[in-house]
């Protein structure tokens, strides 16, 4: 359990960074799709 408590925040931080990066890149190439969904 102690290993989970030290690994979970690191994994969450990496996951949110990757997700934010994907959203930023997607918004740069397809800016209209995020603000005007079909």
Swiss-Prot record:
Q: Which GO terms describe its biological process?
A: photosynthesis
Query: What InterPro entries does the record point to?
Result: PSI_PsaJ (IPR002615), PSI_PsaJ_sf (IPR036062)
Organism listed in the record:
Synechococcus sp. (strain RCC307)
Q: Which GO terms describe its cellular component?
A: photosystem I; plasma membrane-derived thylakoid membrane
Q: What does this protein do?
A: May help in the organization of the PsaE and PsaF subunits.
Please state where this protein is localized: Cellular thylakoid membrane
SUPFAM superfamilies reported in the protein's UniProt record:
Subunit IX of photosystem I reaction centre, PsaJ (SSF81544)
Query: Per the record's keyword annotation, is Transport included, yes or no?
Result: no
| Family label | Belongs to the PsaJ family.
What protein am I looking at? Photosystem I reaction center subunit IX
Q: Which residues cross the membrane?
A: 4-24
* Keyword rRNA processing attached: no
Its membrane topology: Single-pass membrane protein
> What does the UniProt keyword field contain?
Membrane, Photosynthesis, Photosystem I, Thylakoid, Transmembrane, Transmembrane helix
């Amino acid at each position: 359990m102690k290993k989970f408590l030290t690994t979970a925040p690191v994994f969450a931080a990496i996951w949110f960074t990757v997700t934010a990066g994907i959203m930023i890149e997607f918004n740069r190439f397809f800016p209209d799709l995020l603000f005007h969904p079909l």
